Each structure stands twice: as structure tokens, then as C-alpha cells.
From Swiss-Prot:
Name listed for the protein in its UniProt record: Perlin matrix protein
Similarity comment: family membership: Belongs to the N16 matrix protein family.
Transmembrane segments: none
GO cellular component, one term: extracellular region
Signal peptide: 1-26
Keywords linked to the UniProt accession: Disulfide bond, Extracellular matrix, Secreted, Signal
Subcellular location: Secreted, Extracellular space, Extracellular matrix
Organism for this UniProt entry: Margaritifera margaritifera (Freshwater pearl mussel)
Tissue: Component of conchiolin, the organic matrix of nacre. Only expressed in the dorsal region of the mantle.
Top-rank taxon, per record: Eukaryota
Length: 140
């Protein structure tokens, strides 16, 4: 009995360590969109200097359901997979995005602008693109 108890305790400890050591994704609801902060966000954000972007997403079955300002994504949150249409709030002008050291937050977006990289759009360094976009989208 003692041996079985020891094995059970050891197994539970190992399971606990494995559970705690796996990457944890945080789910939050933002307006009518869901977004998920992955442990290292989306693969394309690997140059974002550790700043986690807010990626606003909605469920979609196919890329054709996404609007022109959205990107079709297949994201993993924990053990679940989602197919989504997503856009990001970050225009990468202030160096907190994937910035690569360009732009100081005051000038125009550059060739490595995050939105331009994703969607061919142009923002400027102080985030006006998304401020105007979000105002236009939600304040009507």
C-alpha cells in the first residue's frame, strides 16, 4: 500500500510539473472580437521586442469571410485550434511592435510598418491609423 501511495504521489507531482510548465494562453473578450495572447503571440510577431500585441479576432471558416483589413489566421490557444479573421491594433511606428529599431513614434511609418507588412496598409508613427480606424468603426 505504501509503495502504491508513493507512486501515486510521484505521478501527481510529475503531472503537476508538466501542467505548470506548458505554455499558457490568456483568453479575453474585446468588444465583439475575441483575441488570444499566445505565449509568444503569432509567429510573425517574433521581432516585437517582447511587447504583446492585441490581436482582435472573430471566428471564420474560410479566408473569404475576412474583410480586406483582416488576416485569416489559424491560432492555437492552449490545446484548442481556432480559424479566425484578425486585425491588430498596433501600427508599429513607435518601436513597440516588430519595429526593428525604425521609427521613433513621431514620423511616418516605414517600409517595415506592421500594417504594411500584413495588409499593404500605411500607418504613421504615432498610431493615428488605428485611432482613426477604431473611431470610425466603433463611434458611429
Amino acid at each position: 500500500m505504501t509503495c502504491t501511495l508513493r507512486l501515486t504521489v510521484a505521478a501527481l507531482v510529475l503531472l503537476g510539473i508538466c501542467h505548470l510548465s506548458r505554455p499558457v494562453a490568456a483568453y479575453q473578450k474585446c468588444a465583439r472580437y475575441w483575441y488570444c495572447w499566445l505565449p509568444y503571440d503569432i509567429e510573425r510577431d517574433r521581432y516585437d521586442d517582447g511587447y504583446r500585441l492585441c490581436c482582435y479576432c472573430r471566428n471564420a471558416w474560410t479566408p473569404w469571410q475576412c474583410r480586406e483589413d483582416e488576416q485569416f489566421e489559424r491560432l492555437r490557444c492552449g490545446s484548442r485550434y481556432y480559424t479566425l479573421c484578425c486585425y491588430t491594433e498596433d501600427d508599429n511606428g513607435n518601436g513597440n511592435g516588430n519595429g526593428n529599431g525604425y521609427g521613433n513614434g513621431n514620423g511616418n511609418g516605414n517600409g517595415n510598418n506592421y500594417l504594411k507588412y500584413l495588409f499593404g496598409g500605411n500607418g504613421n508613427g504615432n498610431g493615428e491609423f488605428w485611432e482613426e480606424y477604431i473611431d470610425e468603426r466603433y463611434d458611429k
